[in-house]
Amino acid sequence: MATGKGAAASTQEGKSQPFKVTPGPFDPATWLEWSRQWQGTEGNGHAAASGIPGLDALAGVKIAPAQLGDIQQRYMKDFSALWQAMAEGKAEATGPLHDRRFAGDAWRTNLPYRFAAAFYLLNARALTELADAVEADAKTRQRIRFAISQWVDAMSPANFLATNPEAQRLLIESGGESLRAGVRNMMEDLTRGKISQTDESAFEVGRNVAVTEGAVVFENEYFQLLQYKPLTDKVHARPLLMVPPCINKYYILDLQPESSLVRHVVEQGHTVFLVSWRNPDASMAGSTWDDYIEHAAIRAIEVARDISGQDKINVLGFCVGGTIVSTALAVLAARGEHPAASVTLLTTLLDFADTGILDVFVDEGHVQLREATLGGGAGAPCALLRGLELANTFSFLRPNDLVWNYVVDNYLKGNTPVPFDLLFWNGDATNLPGPWYCWYLRHTYLQNELKVPGKLTVCGVPVDLASIDVPTYIYGSREDHIVPWTAAYASTALLANKLRFVLGASGHIAGVINPPAKNKRSHWTNDALPESPQQWLAGAIEHHGSWWPDWTAWLAGQAGAKRAAPANYGNARYRAIEPAPGRYVKAKA
């Protein structure tokens, strides 16, 4: 043990080093130490504030010696080969850089940068293999993998001016103008509080997005109800009520005429009503899950039935909108009411046993923190979950695509983002009431109680999803990272009546918004519903193109005979208030 001046000097030297000497990089203790030291430095508060997990989960985890040895041996072999190739100037020894971040000629033809990219990819592979090899429960392993991937993605040489040859070339060719423009872009984004992903000035809700013709026929403090103008002379008797997620603006379902699911359904001869959620302000900070069920979902069903003159209507829920719809119908069933002729659930979770990547954000400590700061716990005032925080969290689920890609293009290269309607919608964030959010976190993501008959009481009655005894169409997207398709399939075990499950290609949004005219992607069908989703897929038939025609054919069978299309919006009780898309969707977070 060091004593006297030596000990003091050693202590002082240790304090002056931002990252102390630790065991080798193949020891999980190293990762834990890096994480703790990083969390102790200035400017690191974002991770804790946003709920992004750190690496404290690494405490006590191990890697099997044989597996660790294999990773070490493979790493050292490839590292030595790269080092020798660099010393000899053999660029071809790196092999092709199979990563779009390094696809440009500047990376391929400039040896120092080519080797920098190759060493980075080698280290990234090794760290990922180590994260996958830890001996821990599934949730801990997923958190470690997520934290490692965040660090690895952030440290790409493409993200820094000093190690990005494309940005350096632009800097020289533009005489410094690219850097000047990049700094200007960064300062504007700092003012806005988010990274620009598109040229938002190119879009306006109601002018060139969300343009399907219609009117607001009802509104309260939670939502506006839109009714769309018929595009056919005759329409099915039963209307369709669409309930989008309240964590986003509704117009993902009505971006452009050629990609609008709303317009497509109207063109098939359906009267369409749609919930346009209010963007909560301080006056709604205390709103609860029960409020959204009673005063939004159930109220929308009542108004759509009244205007259409139908005892039963078809109902569609998208993402958390599907969770809200299912809860509302179960509440109504407990009251002896059955207003739905059919239900459509798009990328919806009812069984929250597998919540995909979002599971890394949810544990008892995090939920308690949210309840104390947002949900009115311990006598504290209720507050809003700001849409900007939610949007940033979702962006970091795909950091290379939605964060670092724009850091490089906008800041290092000084480019202006191109107009893109989907990214305009993605950046149009909405707030959430704290109590609503906390209830949703605890009772679904954390405790998975919605699937248990009678476990939850909502609006004063016990909830039993099996009481939703109507034909149900369930859709999942195969590459969905928010609602894994196998989790969407799990709803088939909870609902009671004639069920149809269809699987689409692509992800959470692109899989859903897949108009037939583009003839893109594919979908899978299987009339059987075995217990295992893997068994379902093994017996499924793949069909080229959109799943929309399959769904609209099914929906037509639930919608009743056709009659003359209504000449006016609403009825004597519910008159048109203003043209679609209405005021609520235009409110900014």
UniProtKB/Swiss-Prot annotation:
Its main location: cytoplasm. Forms a biodegradable plastic that is degraded naturally and completely by bacteria into carbon dioxide and water. Utilized in the medical industry. Plates made from PHA-based plastics can be left in place to help heal fractured bones. After the bone has healed, the plastic slowly breaks down in the body. Utilized by Imperial Chemical Industries (ICI) to produce a PHB-PHV (poly-B-valerate) copolymer sold under the trade name 'Biopol'. Biopol is used as packaging material. The PHB-PHV copolymer consists of approximately 20% PHV and 80% PHB. One of its GO terms (biological process) is poly-hydroxybutyrate biosynthetic process. Signal peptide: none annotated. It is found in: Cytoplasm. Pfam families: PhaC_N. The keyword Magnesium does not apply. It catalyses: (3R)-3-hydroxybutanoyl-CoA + [(3R)-hydroxybutanoate](n) = [(3R)-hydroxybutanoate](n+1) + CoA. The keyword Transferase applies. GO terms for molecular function: acyltransferase activity. The active site is at C319. Residues 1-23 are annotated as: Disordered. Pathway: Biopolymer metabolism; poly-(R)-3-hydroxybutanoate biosynthesis. Coiled coil: none annotated. InterPro entries: AB_hydrolase_fold (IPR029058), PHA/PHB_synthase (IPR051321), PHA_synth_I (IPR010963), PhaC_N (IPR010941). Its EC number is 2.3.1.-. Belongs to the PHA/PHB synthase family. Type I PhaC subfamily. Monomer. This is Poly(3-hydroxyalkanoate) polymerase subunit PhaC. It comes from Cupriavidus necator (strain ATCC 17699 / DSM 428 / KCTC 22496 / NCIMB 10442 / H16 / Stanier 337) (Ralstonia eutropha). The gene is phaC.
